[in-house]
Curated annotation (Swiss-Prot):
Glycans are attached at N134, N177, N304, N335. This is Probable lipase C16A3.12c. The active site is at S210 (nucleophile), D378 (charge relay system), H404 (charge relay system). Residues 38-443 are lumenal. The lineage of its organism: Eukaryota, Fungi, Dikarya, Ascomycota, Taphrinomycotina.
Length: 443
C-alpha cells in the first residue's frame, strides 16, 4: 500500500473527468468572450434575440407583479412590493460565521405574543426563495404572517446574505471549507437559540425545504437539547439520500468519484458564474435554460409551475455555496445513506468498507414531533430509505403529482400544502397533536 495516493483519480474515471473538464472550460471561454464584447454590441444582439424569441417561440406577456418581483434586487424589495417589511438580524455561530436572519413583519400587525415559525431554504439558495412569487397568497411566509405567526427566514453560511466570517474572507479557501455537518452542528442550533432569545419564547416551529429539511434533521439528531426547543418539525420536499441523477452520464461521473468536483471547481464557491449568465440572458430564455437543466438532471417536468412564477422564482433561485457541501451530497447519493461528510473518502477504494465506516446522522434519535410532506414525482427523495431512518412518531403526507419545487411554487400549493402546514402548526402549538394526527389520518 506504500504507493497508494489518497488524491488519486483511477483510470476508470478519466473519460468522465475529461468530458466534465471540457464542459467547464467551454463555459469559461464563452463567458470571457462575451465579457470582452463591447456593451453596445451586446445590447444590439440582446434586442434582436428578444424580438426573435417573441416571434418564433412565445408571444406571452407577463403581469405587473411578475415583472416587479423579477427585477427586485433583494428580499427587502420583494417584501416591500407585497406590503411587508424585513428586519435584519445577525447571528454569530460558534465557529465564527456571521449569518443573516430575516424577520418578515406586517406594518399594521404587532409581533407580540405570536407563535414563532423559522423557515429555512435549500441547497445553493437563500431566503428569497420563500417570497419570490407573483401572488402573495402563494408565499408560505406571507400566509403564515396573515395567520398570526411571527416568521423568520434563515440563511446558510456562504450565501448572498451570509458571506461573512470573523477571520476569513470569501476569497480565502478556508472560508468555503464547510459541509452539511457544519450547518447541522452550528448554523441551525445557533439560529434557533438567537430567535428564542430575541422573541422571549421557549420553543419555535421549524419548516425546512429540501436541504433545509435535511440539515435540521441532522441538527436535531446530534443536538438532543435542540429537540426541546422545537414544537414541531415540518419538512417540505426533503432531500434525503436521493437515488441519483436522471442523466446517466452525470450520475456515473459523480457516483464513481465525488471528489471529481474538487478537480473541476476547486475548494471554493461553486458556480459563481451563474450570476453572470443570469444577468445577460433575457429572463424567458434563462427560464428555458433552467427548465432544460432540471429536466436533464432530475427529470422534472415543472408543468405545475406557471411561466410567470418561473420568471419570478428562477430570478432568485441561485445563491452561493461551497463545493464541499455539494461533494457531501454526492457522497450521500453514492452510498444511499444520510451520513456525515467523509473526509477520507478515497480510503473506501483503498481499504474497503469492512475496515472503514462513515458515521450516519442518528435521525432515529429525533424526539420532537415531525411531519414530512413529499411528492410522488420528486426524484430527490428516497422514501424507502428515509422511512427506515425516521423515529416511530414521524408522520408523512404524500402528494402524488408533486415534484420538488412544487412545494414552494406549485399552482395549487394553496390547496395542497398550506392547509396541512397551518393545521399542523396550530394543533401542535395548542397541544392537540394526537387529535391532529387522528383527524388527518396520516400514514
Amino acid at each position: 500500500m506504500s504507493g497508494f495516493n489518497k488524491n488519486q483519480i483511477y483510470w476508470g474515471d478519466y473519460v468522465g473527468v475529461i468530458a466534465a473538464f471540457v464542459g467547464v472550460y467551454t463555459e469559461l471561454v464563452a463567458r470571457i468572450f462575451i465579457y470582452m464584447i463591447p456593451e453596445r454590441v451586446r445590447e444590439w444582439f440582446r434586442v434582436r434575440i428578444i424580438v426573435l424569441y417573441h416571434y418564433y417561440i412565445s408571444s406571452k406577456t407577463t403581469d405587473g407583479m411578475t415583472d416587479a418581483v423579477q427585477k427586485c434586487r433583494n428580499i427587502y424589495e420583494i417584501c416591500e412590493a407585497f406590503g411587508y417589511r424585513v428586519e435584519e438580524h445577525l447571528v454569530r455561530t460558534q465557529d465564527n460565521f456571521i449569518l443573516c436572519l430575516h424577520r418578515i413583519t406586517h406594518p399594521k400587525q404587532s409581533q407580540h405574543k405570536r407563535e414563532v415559525v423559522y423557515c429555512h431554504h435549500g441547497l445553493m439558495t437563500n431566503s428569497e426563495l420563500w417570497v419570490a412569487v407573483n401572488e402573495s397568497e402563494r408565499s408560505l411566509p406571507f400566509v403564515l404572517i396573515e395567520s398570526g405567526y411571527d416568521v423568520w427566514l434563515g440563511n446558510n453560511r456562504g450565501n448572498k446574505y451570509s458571506r461573512k466570517h470573523i477571520t476569513y474572507k470569501p476569497k480565502d479557501e478556508e472560508f468555503w471549507n464547510f459541509s452539511l455537518d457544519d450547518m447541522a452542528m452550528f448554523d441551525i442550533p445557533d439560529t434557533v437559540d438567537y430567535i428564542l432569545r430575541e422573541t422571549g419564547r421557549e420553543k419555535l416551529n421549524y419548516i425546512g425545504f429540501s436541504q433545509g429539511t435535511a440539515q435540521a434533521m441532522a441538527a436535531l439528531s446530534i443536538n438532543p437539547d435542540l429537540n426541546d426547543k422545537v414544537n414541531i418539525f415540518i419538512g417540505l420536499a426533503p432531500a434525503y439520500a436521493p437515488k441519483g441523477f436522471s442523466n446517466y452520464f452525470v450520475d456515473y461521473i459523480v457516483k464513481v468519484n465525488p471528489k471529481i468536483m474538487y478537480h473541476l471547481f476547486g475548494r471554493r464557491c461553486l458556480l459563481p458564474s451563474v450570476t453572470f449568465w443570469q444577468n445577460i440572458c433575457y429572463p424567458p430564455i434563462f427560464v428555458k435554460i433552467v427548465d432544460v437543466s432540471l429536466k436533464i438532471l432530475f427529470n422534472w417536468d415543472l408543468s405545475n409551475i406557471s411561466l410567470n412564477q418561473k420568471l419570478c422564482g428562477y430570478a432568485h433561485l441561485y445563491s452561493f455555496s461551497s463545493v464541499k457541501s455539494v461533494v457531501h451530497w454526492l457522497q450521500i447519493i453514492k452510498n444511499c445513506t444520510f451520513q456525515l461528510y467523509d473526509d477520507d473518502m478515497a480510503l473506501l477504494a483503498g481499504y474497503g468498507s469492512r475496515h472503514y465506516q462513515v458515521p450516519l446522522f442518528p435521525t432515529n434519535n429525533i424526539k420532537c414531533p415531525m411531519l414530512i410532506l413529499w411528492g410522488g414525482k420528486d426524484t430527490l427523495i428516497n422514501m424507502e430509505v428515509m422511512r427506515t431512518a425516521l423515529p416511530p412518531h414521524a408522520k408523512e403526507v404524500s402528494i402524488a403529482h408533486y415534484e420538488h419545487l412544487d412545494f414552494l411554487w406549485g399552482q395549487d400549493v394553496k390547496e395542497e400544502v398550506f392547509p396541512v402546514v397551518i393545521d399542523a402548526l396550530k394543533h401542535h402549538s395548542l397541544g392537540k397533536a394526537k387529535h391532529f394526527v387522528k383527524q388527518n389520518g396520516f400514514h
